[in-house]
Each structure stands twice: as C-alpha cells, then as structure tokens.
Amino acid sequence: MNLKITINQQASISEKLIIANLEQLLIFRDNTFNKIDCDQQITLKDAVQISQILNDQGVLNYEGEINEQITTYLEACGLYSQGQGQFIKRTLQTKKINIPQQDFNNCYGKYDYIEQKFQNQINFFKQVDLKGNQETIDENELLNDGVEVKQVESCASKPRACANCTCGRKEMEEKQDKEQLLEQLKNNSVKGCGSCYLGDAFRCANCPFRGLPAFKDGEQVKVLQDDVFLKEKEETDQIKLENGKVKLMI
C-alpha cells in the first residue's frame, strides 16, 4: 500500500493509494506502507512518524526542497538517501545469540554441602537413681537454732561520736560540753577568743552566747541551766571586757 502526503487531497482514493497530509499520520499503524510520496516540508517529528509507518526497505520519495537539515532528520530516523530525493528505510538486523548453558555445580560462590547431625538432647529432668551409693545431705544439719545477727561496729574506740550516731553517745557528749562550758563561766574562767560580745559571726562553735545579739561591756546577762538570756535592769551575772577578753562576773 502506498501513501501520498500532499496538501491537495482532491485525487480519488483507491485501495492501493491513500492521500493524506502530515496531520493525519497518527491514525496509521506501524509498518503500513511500502512507498510514501511527500511534497510537504517535514520536521523531525514528521520524520519520526514517517519512519514508524514505513515498512523495512520501504521507499520515501520526497518532492520538497531537500537540504542538509531534512537529510539529517531522515537519517536519524533510520532512512538513508539514494539520491534525487529518494530515501529507503533500513532493515533492522537481528542476530540470534546462543548462550551456553551454565553449569551451576561449579558456579562461583557455591559452598559445599555438609550434612549436619543433630545431637541428642539432654534430659535435665531425668529421674535420679537412688539405689546407688550416692551420698545424700541430711536436711536437719542445715537447720540452726541461732539467729545470725550482723554485729554493729563499735564506736567505743573513737574519740568522738559518729556523725550519724544512733546509740545516744552524741547527745550525751553535747550535754557534757554544755555543762563544762557553764562550769567554766561560773568559775570565772576567761575565754581566749575575746570576741563573744561582737556577735555570732565572731563566736566559737561551742560558745554559750551563740544566738544572742552583740552586747557591750557592762550589759547584764542571766545564765539559766543550758541557756543564756540577755536581761536589762536586773541584778544578775555581769559580763565585763578586760584586756580584749570576756569575763563572766558571778
């Protein structure tokens, strides 16, 4: 079957000749025509469509102006020039390739098969035979009437009570320290620091006046058991400052 591509479609259509234009090429199937006559200016898209509907060794007679660009389009679509505007479509050559069958027994990466035998499972709950000469343990020997109590480390060898003392030694030592300080004050003892009157910031850790505000020489204080109170306008124990040292006058 032949195809004539032209703008003028007034000619009669026969069974062996079809007259159409470039816009109608999409309606044709592949490998439809043996010969195509074309007198229109074709583009690369038109050359691709002409190559698709032309049979192998089919002939294209191009009646338009032939230039280098048209020739390049047609050659890119698989047609070669025969001169005088005639182009022939190349036959696609196919060659059968025989691929040898691969021997998978010696292929790379295959490992030798090693048959693995499963070991006999050990029965951990197997009944023990008591008829033998096996020694048994008397359960009565495991019992002990005595209760094991962890012995608390003694602090008798330490000079002072522990920081987290729970035996009462810490409270007893604090009470003894307070009694000793009060006894020293009542016996007209002299404090070596000489800064009790300045306030808590300048007093010792065991100073009996801790907690009291700063006082001046001649102010009256009253000592009642473990506490020291600041009193005014009462005749009681008197504190005096002599040579930078504090004395309790009883």
Curated annotation (Swiss-Prot):
Residues that coordinate or bind [2Fe-2S] cluster: 155, 162, 165, 167
Record-listed [4Fe-4S] cluster binding positions: 193, 196, 204, 207
GO BP annotations listed: iron-sulfur cluster assembly
Residue numbers spanned by region N-terminal SAM-like domain: 1-102
Motif Cx2C motif 1, chain ranges: 193-196
Record's subcellular location: Cytoplasm; Mitochondrion intermembrane space
Cellular component annotations (GO), alphabetically ordered: cytoplasm; mitochondrial intermembrane space
Keywords, sorted A to Z: 2Fe-2S, 4Fe-4S, Cytoplasm, Iron, Iron-sulfur, Metal-binding, Mitochondrion
Cofactor requirements of the protein: [2Fe-2S] cluster; [4Fe-4S] cluster
Region (Fe-S binding site A): 155-167
Source species, domain of life: Eukaryota
Pfam families: CIAPIN1
Free-text note regarding domains: The C-terminal domain binds 2 Fe-S clusters but is otherwise mostly in an intrinsically disordered conformation. The N-terminal domain has structural similarity with S-adenosyl-L-methionine-dependent methyltransferases, but does not bind S-adenosyl-L-methionine. It is required for correct assembly of the 2 Fe-S clusters.
Role, per record: Component of the cytosolic iron-sulfur (Fe-S) protein assembly (CIA) machinery. Required for the maturation of extramitochondrial Fe-S proteins. Part of an electron transfer chain functioning in an early step of cytosolic Fe-S biogenesis, facilitating the de novo assembly of a [4Fe-4S] cluster on the cytosolic Fe-S scaffold complex. Electrons are transferred from NADPH via a FAD- and FMN-containing diflavin oxidoreductase.
Assigned protein family: Belongs to the anamorsin family.
Subunit structure, interactors included: Monomer.
Name recorded for this polypeptide: Anamorsin homolog 2
